[in-house]
Swiss-Prot record:
Protein name (Swiss-Prot/TrEMBL): Arginine-containing cyclodipeptide synthase avaA
Catalytic activity as recorded in UniProt: L-tryptophyl-tRNA(Trp) + L-arginyl-tRNA(Arg) = cyclo(L-arginyl-L-tryptophyl) + tRNA(Trp) + tRNA(Arg) + H(+)
Annotated phenotype, changing residue 515 to F: Reduces drastically cyclodipeptide formation
Glycoprotein is among the record's keywords: no
């Protein structure tokens, strides 16, 4: 990795026409991050105050820039930062467009110019992620800029965010329509995995795991744990805050009109059924193992889906707004068939059987027929795992598919409100970028097939502020779960020798240090309510 060059510049980016650009001040508050390191017997956490350009300590490939400068090169950090800011500014303008001058007040003879009630601030800071290819690979280094974009909401605490965005689908006419008061349906999609790879003993998307010497397939223990993992807690927190910023902006800006802002949570279960079935087909586990695995996954699905839903609603209501949150169920026909065959008949249905019931049974059948019609034959799923992965893309696209199949009025209809292009916002970890890319590609085919029905897909990917220390690859709590007992060597408020302040903490303690005591207390209450606290361990349904 090359050293980070320090720059001191003045901000020239004005995100809103009614907000004057201000120079960067040396007094702006620092950013705190936590770094988790795994050791032989116990993981540890250290906290770092980022108040200058620097590498994030012990986190390979990650750095922090306090003042971004445009270096004049197309792929420079400054250029990438500017593109992220421009993308989020477009999304912000769609959700809460600059209000036109109001009519002249008959009493005061004055005209009031109103701006967005949610103020967007470009802090000219960023996290930089540089992923180097594996040894002997010809792939390029992939750099991602997560720009710091803070939101000041009319009520409630401000939101400090580091985001990467994709908004190239937003056209000038979309912004023009928003400024003229054209309303549009808004759907925010997000997702979360279950457990962690450490608890599962495998990576769900990779399939069968093998031993270290690659001589035998690993059969993981059944996931009986009832305690929320660090990954689940941190993901709920990060996604909830980003979604709250978008939902509050849209609510106060009025861009959704009388329609509720809908948040759809894609919490997998079909994806987690695949692994034990592959073990069963390999003759490594019994039917009883598979049945118990299904039961435990179903329980975790209910708990984590409710935890994420409640966390989002809490963060939105802290800012005096509301939102409709639904858990997706687009694969319900397939999961019901799978459960019937496996639990009732001890048979594994074929992938063609699964595709048939998705296309012809249940409330989502028309959407699935529309979806599969735009999927190339070579991309159609050949096994259960590839079908489960395809379902992620379906769920992101579902609001558009539903509009096509139910013949919802288009912008040219005569509904009670004029309607712009439906806005689909994917809020997810940057590791899920492939879902966005594939949905974006399929939506272009969808537009051609639907004679102009043109949903507007954008992506918002929040960076974590709790990092894992790895030799290579992306920092991720799912793959590198530090466990529930972590040695804290340097609390943010401490001074002097870190050994004097050593103690054992849990995930919620670390989340509280980074995101605040209110977030920590809320999560503690919610995990107790949902049976995900340490006190619930070993208590089975």
């Amino acid at each position: 990795m090359t050293a980070t060059v320090q720059h001191t510049v003045k901000t020239e980016v004005c995100l809103r026409g009614d907000v004057a650009s201000q120079p960067i001040s040396d007094s702006k508050p620092p950013t705190w991050v936590a770094v988790l390191q795994q050791h032989e017997y116990q993981s540890s956490v250290t906290y770092h105050k980022l108040d200058d350009n620097r590498l994030i300590p012990d986190v390979f490939g990650y750095s922090y820039l306090r003042d971004i400068a445009d270096q004049g090169k197309k792929q420079s950090t400054g250029k990438q930062h500017a593109r992220v800011i421009q993308a989020y500014s477009k999304i912000h303008s769609l959700l809460s467009p600059p209000w036109k001058s109001s009519s002249i007040d008959s009493n005061t003879k004055t005209r009031e110019n109103k701006g967005s009630p949610v103020i967007l601030e470009d802090k000219r800071c960023a996290f930089i992620e540089r992923l180097e290819p594996p040894p002997n690979s010809k792939a390029d280094i992939v750099s991602t800029v997560f720009a710091q974009v803070n939101l000041q909401t009319p009520t409630g605490p401000p939101l400090e965010q580091f985001l990467s965005c994709r908004a190239s689908n937003i056209k000038a006419n979309d912004l023009k329509n928003a400024a003229e008061g054209v309303r549009r349906p808004i759907t925010i999609s997000t997702g979360i995995c279950l457990f962690s790879s450490r608890l599962l003993g495998f990576i769900p998307t990779n399939g069968l795991s093998v031993s270290h010497d690659a001589t035998e397939t690993v059969v993981p223990p059944l996931p009986y744990t009832t305690v929320a993992t660090f990954y689940e807690l941190e993901t709920c927190t990060r996604m909830a805050m980003t979604i709250a910023g978008l939902a509050v902006t849209a609510s106060t800006g009025g861009t959704a009109g009388s329609r509720p802002i809908v948040v759809r949570l894609d919490v997998p279960n079909l994806q987690y059924y695949c692994y034990p079935l592959e073990l069963l087909e390999a003759g490594l586990v019994s039917w009883e193992y598979v049945e118990e695995w299904f039961r435990l996954v179903d329980r975790r699905h209910r708990q984590v889906a409710t935890l994420l839903k409640d966390t989002i609603i809490h963060e939105v209501r802290r800012r005096n707004c509301d939102v409709q949150v639904d858990v997706t169920s687009g694969t319900i026909a397939a999961t019901q068939l799978l459960r019937l065959c496996v639990l009732g008949r001890r048979k594994i249905p074929s992938v063609n059987d699964m595709l048939f019931v998705l296309s012809w049974i249940g409330p989502y059948q028309a959407a699935w027929r529309e979806f599969l019609a735009i999927v190339d034959d070579c991309q159609r799923p050949k096994d259960l795992r590839s079908l489960a992965l395809m379902a992620y893309v379906f769920e992101v696209m579902y609001p558009a598919l539903q509009q096509a199949t139910t013949k919802t009025k288009t912008p040219h209809g005569k509904g009670e409100e004029s309607s712009g292009r439906p806005l689909l916002i994917q809020v997810d970890d940057i590791a899920e970028w492939r879902i966005f890319d594939r949905a974006e590609m399929l939506l272009k085919r969808f537009k051609h097939r639907q004679h102009g029905l043109d949903p507007l897909l954008v992506g918002v990917f929040p960076s974590p502020r709790i990092f894992t220390s790895e030799d290579q690859g992306r920092s991720t709590l799912f793959l590198h779960d530090p466990g529930l007992k972590i040695s804290q060597t340097r609390p943010p408020s401490s001074g002097g020798d870190s050994e004097d302040h050593s103690c054992v903490v849990g995930p919620l303690d670390i989340i509280g240090q980074i995101y605040g005591a209110e977030v920590q207390d809320t999560l503690m209450r919610l995990i107790i309510e949902r049976g995900l606290s340490p006190e619930d361990e070993f208590e089975l349904d």
